[in-house]
A protein has these predicted regions:
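A transmembrane-helix-recognition feature enriched in membrane-embedded lipid enzymes
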Residues: 1-60, 111-112, 116
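Soluble catalytic domains of membrane acyltransferases
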Residues: 54-158
Length: 158
């Protein structure tokens, strides 16, 4: 049964993504960052809804009393899967995700990343890349956006 549910999710995820895929690049090309972020949140909400209904995955937020949405902050997270990246798009209204530049090489997905409101870093750049990331993060926080960073980088097991 798990295989059937997984395949059903894969098919519906593909259909949902195809239905949404014209909107995000169009808004990005029109340079409408607010609407682009709203479209991304709509898409991630649909993906999380499918994963809940079909796979039984639930998003449970703990410590909400410590969440202060009136001011931007930095979220530091251990990267377990793609799921938490999607979840943060729902939990935090205006989040800027720090991601590795190599993801831009993935066909189609890379184009979306390049036009999404994200901070892309070259991990081979050492201190120069760190300085650029900090500079961009400061700029985004000044704009009122929170930052999500996975300091371990690629998925960790901690």
């Amino acid at each position: 049964m798990l295989i059937v549910r997984s395949r059903l999710f894969d098919v519906l995820f593909g259909i949902w993504t195809l239905l949404q895929s014209p909107f995000i690049p169009a808004l990005a090309l029109l340079q409408r960052p607010g609407l682009t972020r709203a479209a991304i949140r709509f898409w991630t909400g649909g993906v999380l809804g499918l994963s809940h209904r079909i796979l039984g995955l639930r998003l449970q937020e703990e410590g909400i009393e410590n969440k202060h949405l009136e001011a931007p902050c930095i979220y530091v997270c251990n990267h377990q899967s793609t799921w938490e990246t999607l979840a943060f798009n729902q939990l935090v209204p205006d989040i800027c995700i720090v991601a590795k530049q190599e993801l831009r090489k993935i066909p189609v997905f890379g184009w979306f990343l390049g036009h999404a409101p994200m901070i892309l870093i070259d991990r081979s750049g050492g201190g120069r890349a760190m300085a650029a990331m900090i500079s961009e993060a400061r700029r985004e926080v000044a704009r009122g956006r929170s930052i999500l960073i996975f300091p371990e980088g690629t998925r960790g097991h901690a």
